[in-house]
């Protein structure tokens, strides 16, 4: 390496440093370098070469190699300043010890497959037994070659040499700036009354009165009132805002409310600085964006715990110069004591937070507890300070730190001074709370110094410490206290007011903490042993992290329909499998990104609340099973027999199963099914199938480990320490079990003997999820092995080991190998570079113009969701495109500003399957639009500007990016009414869509609507009745017939059925309770009061007041029972019940407003009484269509195809009459359908002599558009007139729409006849089998079917 390369490179400084090590070269090189660099390029090139030759010959320098330069550079970078991070106060970056220079690669010998070229014709070059393919050889051979393997990049700087600024440090700075930001005092225009009351004389009188009254009002003397300008600004806030309120300081709970009248509370506002500041805070929270108010807590630092500390302690307390005995100084301490009680409600949490603060200092302290487990004495050394605290007191943190002088510390550090006599009053009298405040304030000072010299390792250590200490996400202290309190409310004892005996459940029986579960090596155990928590130095591979997850809350277990056997003792049912929820995907992903690799389910606390009467002889055998094994003995992790006649029960079970987080994230669906609750019931018969039996709440204790080296070995038979607090007489929870801790609450009844049973494993047939992408499915298990349980006597001893068998069958091995997901790990997008304000959830948006004048039915906008997603190309859209489908529901937000006086309503329709005809462009009739269940935005109601698009509910599937498929998802924006108050100009508003909820399962909805249609399906209808208007000054009654299944017909002749009509058309009538919503859409200038009743006859005004009714002024959600002479109402015609809407007060409006009061009724659903729901007689068999010959006078050969989709048929060869029935309506009003049916054909021959009858019919089954794939064929002559064919409606992917063109891969039946004129008529009927499914919600038909050349299915009834 010559001087030319040396000085021209970027490492010139390091090269000079290396050369300066040679004696006498330093000054000469510097002078020469300056001289040569001042010359031109040619001279510099020659000078470098000449200088190097001269120096090499005279000085005999050793040539500077790359290795020598790398070693010197690393030595310079590994200095003490760099290690201590004090080389520079800048917080942007720091150097890495690798110097940015990659390590040298390594040469390795590898076997490489080298092809052997074929020998030319007539020649043979093959030798040594290796032949080419031409001479019948392999044509290739293995040769050993040397390959250079590059060294891995530095994990700290990725080869750049500079460690970037840490994200925790950036977060700390942003939080510090946010907390130190100040806001100006509100300066609202002052009312003349405020100015009058704020005059100097009036304000002086007010301050004088407040000085004498403050003792009785706030329990202390207020010697420092605010000035007049401050009081007037606060009083103006009360004057302007009727919903404002401010409480007096102290514990009297008095408050002042807002109002603008002369006798309202604004004139009673005292000149108190604290009350004025509270009003200013309230005003800023309402009007100032990003306003931040520090939370009230003792020792809370915003994540991570750094920043300003806010202690709600009395600020003006006189510290007594002598030690006092149990008395608290004067002043209001309720707020401080509330916070202290919140932390010390459990002594463990209080000491935990206390030690965390104390861990920042060297020393040791010892806390003594009294008989009530409260701190009574603290002795020790902390931060070089002697500590002796004997009495708790209240201190002023604002004055605490400045009042500590150096002399105080000098006295404390003197070992010769007696602790009891010479301790300064400041440290002796403040008690535990004073020590706590001192530590917190001192820690805040230390952290501010730390910000000037950031240490990456120290910041990461603190974050890791907080994560491991809290056992989950980093939360603030108030949030952590709130979580603990809510947790105790769930598991602690509470009074059962509605129980049969009103008894109390023992709190000790229902409380389980981490210390009870994680015995040895746990983090909290280390805290106790060390006394003071020390900051973790790096991530120890032996370190474990424990989490407590509320996996299932209020999960309902229903009584199964399958009964295995019965005897004189009772009935033994089949198994009911309930998947226990696991931590959410986002939480699991955060743990994996933080470095945790494995998760072990250690303990499962299963709490059971019985829904059967007390002392009912019903037992349940609950087993926690592993969902990834076909052998019942291997899958059965733990189980217990529970008596359900005692209302409350709980089981502590030990699954002890570990999973790898990487595979869990790749195949998250399989991870969610890893723990399954299997329940077998035994008891007296008489329970109905589907009846709620008991509910469960499962609390899972999980241990996370960074490597396989970490973790604690938990044994199922070594849990005596856990049982110490849960054992005793009458504390057993269950009757018998295996691999469980012990009995914790035994019933008072004697258990009966349960019969022998066979326990089956978790079924491997998961819910079928079909997609339109043709992806392969996982292999399903063909065989499983059950476990025979002969008696519960063997389980009486609790921890009874169960024998395990290894399932080595080929089917099981193939299944376990097939469990691995075929999907690759998707690359993660950078969360910090886009969508910061929306949290990364913004999907797309559309700008819509609202004209100044509109008519009802005006189409404001129509746009395709797919087009908008691809045009916007946000981070969410990129993720969907990578996954191949829309994986979350959408939340739509309309930014049309609220206006209570305009009196207009906007309808938003999600047409998922393109049912709205193409000829609808600028106007859409409201009678047709309301059949789509639109979302109504009322400008006078702010809450209606947001709604959710549920793809599984409305579409029946997730939207796929690989193609449009059957979905044509469009959003229609329609004006539903006119402006009741004239607008000055048109306006534009934004309609935005954000992602919402958990990740959807790819493919079809998991629980679609299926046959047979029952009364329980009527609970979710969402049926909108026609909007009505009552003219101003009109006192009348309007009737809405409850004929909910009738078709809708518009003035233009269009007909439509809603999804609710499709369900209700399966019933002649319904009875029960109707849940509905009444919304007022008129202007706020138009006011009225309505009374709504549901009755069978027209009621009188006095009768209306006595019967069940609902009074409506603006908006109301209500429920009314169907009242009629028949106890139910007809779904067709006007002979049933009706909504009677009567005006209690006729609509009123100002003189210039002449429009009436507009409102609409939306029926949410019907809580039907099954005994009052009369079903149609032909509920399983429906007439489809009738085929007739066009001309009987001549021969008419025909070929008519029946498609595999239900819809209106049309043809140019025959006359087609389509029938209307419940099945046709339901197919037309849903998105897709799929299932097995039987198609029945019946025909009628023209009357003729048998010998002259020449009629023939042929029924051909096939697949595809062309007649290439032919199935069964049946021919009939004049002696037959019926034919039945089992048939499956659907597409190659499963479900299919009710209209559209036939696919290339689709089943069909073709009717062929050489002369159809011999047939008078041919009827086609459909017999629906159980399990026929319907996906999505829509409306139809909205158009009249057009005549085409061939028979085709047209969407309709």
UniProtKB/Swiss-Prot annotation:
<keyword id="KW-1031">Host cell junction</keyword>
<keyword id="KW-0813">Transport</keyword>
<dbReference type="InterPro" id="IPR005305">
    <property type="entry name" value="Nepo_coat_C"/>
</dbReference>
<keyword id="KW-0946">Virion</keyword>
<keyword id="KW-1048">Host nucleus</keyword>
<dbReference type="Pfam" id="PF03688">
    <property type="entry name" value="Nepo_coat_C"/>
</dbReference>
<protein>
    <recommendedName>
        <fullName>RNA2 polyprotein</fullName>
    </recommendedName>
</protein>
<keyword id="KW-0916">Viral movement protein</keyword>
<dbReference type="InterPro" id="IPR029053">
    <property type="entry name" value="Viral_coat"/>
</dbReference>
<comment type="similarity">
    <text>Belongs to the nepoviruses RNA2 polyprotein family.</text>
</comment>
<dbReference type="GO" id="GO:0042025">
    <property type="term" value="C:host cell nucleus"/>
</dbReference>
<dbReference type="Pfam" id="PF03689">
    <property type="entry name" value="Nepo_coat_N"/>
</dbReference>
<dbReference type="InterPro" id="IPR005306">
    <property type="entry name" value="Nepo_coat_N"/>
</dbReference>
<keyword id="KW-0167">Capsid protein</keyword>
<keyword id="KW-1035">Host cytoplasm</keyword>
<dbReference type="GO" id="GO:0019028">
    <property type="term" value="C:viral capsid"/>
</dbReference>
<dbReference type="GO" id="GO:0030430">
    <property type="term" value="C:host cell cytoplasm"/>
</dbReference>
<dbReference type="Pfam" id="PF03391">
    <property type="entry name" value="Nepo_coat"/>
</dbReference>
<dbReference type="GO" id="GO:0005198">
    <property type="term" value="F:structural molecule activity"/>
</dbReference>
<dbReference type="InterPro" id="IPR005054">
    <property type="entry name" value="Nepo_coat"/>
</dbReference>
<dbReference type="GO" id="GO:0046740">
    <property type="term" value="P:transport of virus in host, cell to cell"/>
</dbReference>
<dbReference type="GO" id="GO:0044219">
    <property type="term" value="C:host cell plasmodesma"/>
</dbReference>
């Amino acid at each position: 390496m010559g001087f030319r390369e040396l000085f021209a490179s970027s490492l010139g400084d390091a090269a000079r440093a290396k050369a300066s090590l040679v004696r006498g070269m330093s000054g000469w090189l510097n002078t020469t370098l300056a001289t040569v660099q001042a010359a031109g390029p040619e001279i510099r090139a020659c000078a470098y070469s000449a200088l190097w030759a001269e120096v090499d010959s005279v000085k005999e320098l050793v040539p500077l190699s790359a290795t020598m330069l790398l070693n010197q550079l690393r030595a310079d970078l590994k200095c003490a300043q760099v290690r201590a991070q004090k080389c520079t106060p800048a917080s942007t970056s720091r150097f890495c010890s690798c110097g940015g220079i990659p390590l040298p690669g390594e040469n390795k010998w590898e076997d490489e497959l080298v092809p052997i070229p074929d020998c030319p014709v007539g020649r043979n070059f093959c030798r040594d037994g290796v032949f080419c393919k031409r001479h019948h050889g392999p044509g290739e051979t293995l040769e050993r070659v040397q390959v250079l393997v590059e060294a891995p990049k530095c994990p700290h700087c990725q080869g750049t040499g500079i460690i970037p600024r840490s994200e925790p440090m950036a977060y700390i700075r942003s939080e510090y700036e946010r907390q130190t930001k100040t806001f100006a005092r509100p300066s609202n225009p002052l009312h003349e009354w405020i100015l009058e009351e704020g005059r100097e004389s009036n304000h002086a009188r007010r301050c004088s009165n407040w000085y004498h009254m403050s003792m009785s009002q706030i329990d202390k003397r207020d010697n420092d009132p605010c000035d007049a300008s401050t009081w007037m600004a606060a009083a103006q806030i009360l004057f302007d805002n009727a919903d404002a309120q401010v409480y007096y300081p102290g514990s009297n709970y008095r408050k002042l409310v807002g109002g603008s009248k002369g006798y309202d509370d604004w004139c009673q506002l005292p000149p108190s600085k604290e009350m004025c500041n509270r009003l200013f805070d309230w005003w800023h929270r309402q009007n100032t964006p990003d306003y931040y108010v520090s939370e009230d807590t003792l020792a809370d630092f915003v994540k991570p715990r750094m920043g300003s500390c806010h202690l709600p302690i009395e600020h003006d307390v006189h510290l007594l110069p002598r030690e006092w005995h149990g008395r608290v100084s004067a002043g209001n301490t309720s707020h401080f004591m509330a916070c202290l009680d919140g932390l010390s409600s459990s002594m463990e949490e209080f000491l935990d937070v206390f030690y965390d603060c104390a861990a920042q200092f060297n020393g040791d302290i010892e806390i003594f507890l009294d008989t009530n487990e409260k701190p009574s004495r603290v002795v020790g050394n902390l931060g070089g300070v002697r500590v002796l605290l004997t009495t708790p007191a209240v201190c002023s943190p604002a004055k605490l730190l400045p009042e500590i002088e150096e002399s105080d510390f000098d006295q404390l550090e003197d070992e010769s001074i007696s602790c009891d006599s010479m301790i300064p009053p400041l440290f002796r009298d403040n008690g535990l709370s004073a020590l706590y405040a001192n530590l917190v304030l001192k820690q805040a000072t230390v952290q501010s110094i730390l910000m000037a010299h950031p240490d990456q390792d120290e910041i990461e250590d603190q974050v890791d410490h907080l994560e491991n200490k809290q056992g989950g996400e980093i939360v603030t202290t108030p949030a952590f206290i709130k979580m603990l309190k809510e947790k105790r409310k769930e598991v602690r004892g509470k009074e059962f007011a509605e129980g049969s005996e009103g008894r109390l459940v023992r709190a000790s029986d229902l409380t389980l903490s981490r210390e009870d579960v994680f015995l040895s090596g746990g983090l909290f155990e280390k805290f106790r042993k060390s006394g003071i928590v020390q900051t973790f130095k790096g991530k120890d591979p032996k370190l474990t992290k424990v989490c407590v997850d509320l996996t299932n809350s209020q999960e309902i277990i229903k009584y199964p329909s399958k009964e295995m056997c019965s005897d004189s003792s009772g009935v033994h049912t089949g198994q009911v499998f309930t998947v226990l929820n696991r931590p959410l995907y986002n939480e699991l992903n955060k743990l994996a990104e933080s470095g945790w690799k494995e998760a072990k389910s250690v303990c499962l606390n299963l709490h059971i609340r019985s829904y059967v009467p007390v002392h009912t002889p019903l037992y349940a055998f609950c087993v926690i099973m592993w969902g990834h094994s076909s052998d019942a003995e291997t899958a059965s992790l733990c189980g217990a027999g529970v008596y359900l006649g005692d209302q409350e029960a709980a089981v502590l079970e030990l699954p002890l199963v570990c999973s790898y987080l990487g595979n869990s994230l790749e195949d998250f669906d399989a991870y969610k099914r890893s723990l399954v609750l299997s329940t077998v019931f035994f008891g007296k018969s008489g329970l109905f199938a589907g009846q709620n039996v008991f509910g469960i709440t499962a609390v899972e204790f999980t241990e996370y480990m960074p490597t396989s080296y970490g973790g604690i070995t938990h044994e199922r038979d070594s849990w005596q320490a856990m049982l110490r607090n849960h054992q005793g007489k009458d504390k057993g929870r269950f009757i018998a079990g295996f691999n469980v801790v012990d009995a914790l609450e035994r019933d008072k009844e004697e258990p009966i003997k349960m019969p022998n049973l066979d326990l089956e494993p978790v079924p491997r047939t998961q819910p079928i999820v079909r997609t339109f992408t043709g992806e392969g499915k996982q292999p399903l298990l063909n065989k499983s092995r059950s476990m025979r349980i002969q008696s519960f006597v063997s389980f009486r001893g609790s921890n009874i080991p169960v024998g395990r068998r290894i399932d080595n069958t080929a089917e099981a091995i193939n299944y376990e190998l097939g469990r691995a997901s075929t999907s690759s790990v998707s690359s993660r997008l950078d969360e910090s570079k886009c969508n910061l304000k929306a949290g990364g959830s913004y999907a797309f948006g559309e700008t819509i113009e609202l004209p100044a004048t509109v008519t009802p039915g005006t189409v404001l906008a129509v746009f395709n969701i797919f087009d908008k997603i691809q045009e916007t190309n946000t981070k969410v859209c990129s993720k969907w495109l990578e996954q191949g489908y829309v994986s979350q529901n959408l939340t739509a937000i309309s930014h049309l500003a609220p206006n209570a006086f305009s009196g207009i309503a906007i309808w938003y329709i999600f047409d998922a399957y393109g049912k709205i005809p193409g000829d609808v462009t600028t106007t859409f009739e409201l009678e047709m639009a309301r059949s789509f269940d639109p979302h109504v935005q009322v400008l006078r109601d702010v809450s209606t500007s947001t709604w959710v698009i549920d793809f599984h509910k409305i579409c029946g599937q997730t939207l796929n990016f690989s193609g449009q498929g059957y979905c044509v998802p469009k959003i229609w924006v329609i004006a539903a009414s006119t402006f009741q108050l004239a607008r000055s100009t048109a306006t534009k508003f934004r309609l935005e869509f954000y992602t919402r909820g958990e990740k959807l399962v790819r493919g079809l909805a998991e629980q679609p609507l299926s046959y047979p249609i029952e009364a329980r399906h009527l609970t979710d209808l969402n049926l909108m009745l026609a909007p009505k208007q009552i003219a101003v000054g009109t006192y009348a009654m309007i009737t809405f017939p409850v004929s909910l299944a009738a078709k809708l017909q518009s003035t233009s002749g269009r007909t439509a059925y809603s999804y609710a009509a499709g369900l209700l058309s399966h019933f002649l009538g319904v009875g029960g309770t109707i849940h509905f919503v009444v919304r007022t859409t008129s202007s706020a200038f138009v006011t009225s009061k309505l009374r709504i009743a549901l009755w069978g006859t027209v009621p009188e005004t006095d009768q209306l007041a006595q019967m069940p009714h609902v009074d409506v002024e603006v908006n109301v959600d209500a429920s009314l029972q169907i009242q009629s002479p028949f106890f139910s109402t007809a779904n067709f015609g006007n002979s049933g019940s009706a909504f009677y809407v009567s005006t209690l007060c006729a609509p009123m409006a100002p003189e210039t407003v002449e429009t009436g009061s507009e409102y609409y009724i939306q029926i949410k659903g019907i809580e039907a009484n099954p005994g009052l729901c009369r079903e149609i007689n032909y509920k399983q068999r429906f007439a489809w269509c009738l085929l007739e010959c066009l001309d009987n006078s001549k021969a008419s050969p025909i070929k008519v195809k029946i498609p595999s989709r239900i819809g209106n048929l049309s043809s140019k060869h025959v006359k087609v009459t389509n029938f209307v029935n419940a099945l046709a309506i339901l197919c037309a009003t849903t998105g897709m359908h799929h299932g097995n049916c039987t198609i029945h054909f019946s025909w009628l021959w023209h009357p003729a002599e048998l010998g002259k009858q020449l009629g023939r019919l042929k029924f051909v089954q096939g697949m595809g558009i062309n007649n290439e794939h032919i199935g069964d064929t049946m021919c009939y002559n004049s002696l037959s007139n019926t034919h039945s064919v089992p048939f499956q409606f659907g597409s190659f992917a499963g479900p299919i729409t009710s209209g559209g063109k036939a696919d290339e891969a689709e089943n069909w039946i073709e009717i062929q006849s050489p002369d159809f004129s011999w047939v008078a008529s041919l009827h086609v009927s459909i017999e629906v089998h159980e399990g026929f499914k319907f996906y999505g919600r829509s409306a139809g038909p909205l158009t009249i079917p057009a005549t085409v050349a061939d028979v085709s299915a047209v969407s309709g009834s």
